[in-house]
């Protein structure tokens, strides 16, 4: 079975006191652009922009202050911190895990009605909708085991 130990659970989010304002990293290929000729994804960042994060079963997604482009969808969203302060203490070392996957851009639709028509305008908010990694872990758990190679 594929390991899920780097995927953030509710317990991880609570233990490390992940909260709005925390910076996250996102890997993706905005408009198909690559970081270099070797084809690596582009690393960008944003801050958690919604509350609450848990319980993930209830919230399902969270918002990241991050402008989404075509090619970002499906990209991993990573938490990475060195010497993080939580539970009132500085914890020396690196904390890293996968928070989720980019789903879409958050937008609001404005409806303007007149006597003869209704016009809808979509307003981009430069916010990414992130699917919690707990749902990725659930998917992985449904996969069949990887067959063992035979000599």
Could you say what each language-model-derived stretch is?
Residues 6-35:
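Short glycine/Trp-rich loop-beta-loop segment that forms part of the substrate-binding cleft
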Residues 21, 48, 73-77, 132:
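Terminal peptide-recognition signature
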Residues 1-2:
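Conserved catalytic-core segment of clan PA serine endopeptidases
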Residues 36-42, 51-60:
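Gly/Ser-enriched beta-turn/beta-hairpin loop segments
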Residues 66-101:
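Catalytic nucleophile loop of clan PA
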Residues 111-151:
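PDZ/PDZ-like groove recognition
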Residues 28, 98-109:
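Short beta->alpha transition motifs characteristic of CBS
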């Amino acid at each position: 079975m594929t390991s899920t130990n780097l995927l953030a659970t509710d317990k991880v989010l609570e233990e490390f006191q992940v909260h709005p304002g925390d910076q996250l990293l996102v890997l993706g290929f905005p408009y198909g652009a690559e970081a270099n000729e070797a084809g690596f994804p582009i690393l960008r960042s944003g801050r958690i922009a919604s509350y609450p994060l848990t319980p993930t079963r209830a919230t399902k997604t969270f918002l990241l202050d991050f402008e989404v482009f075509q090619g970002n969808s499906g990209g991993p969203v990573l938490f990475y911190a060195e010497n993080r302060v939580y539970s009132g203490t500085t914890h020396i070392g690196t904390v890293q895990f996968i928070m989720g996957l980019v789903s879409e851009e958050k937008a609001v639709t404005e409806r303007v009605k007149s006597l003869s028509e209704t016009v809808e305008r979509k307003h981009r908010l430069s916010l990414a909708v992130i699917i919690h990694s707990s749902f990725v872990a659930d998917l992985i758990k449904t996969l069949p085991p990887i067959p063992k190679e035979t000599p």
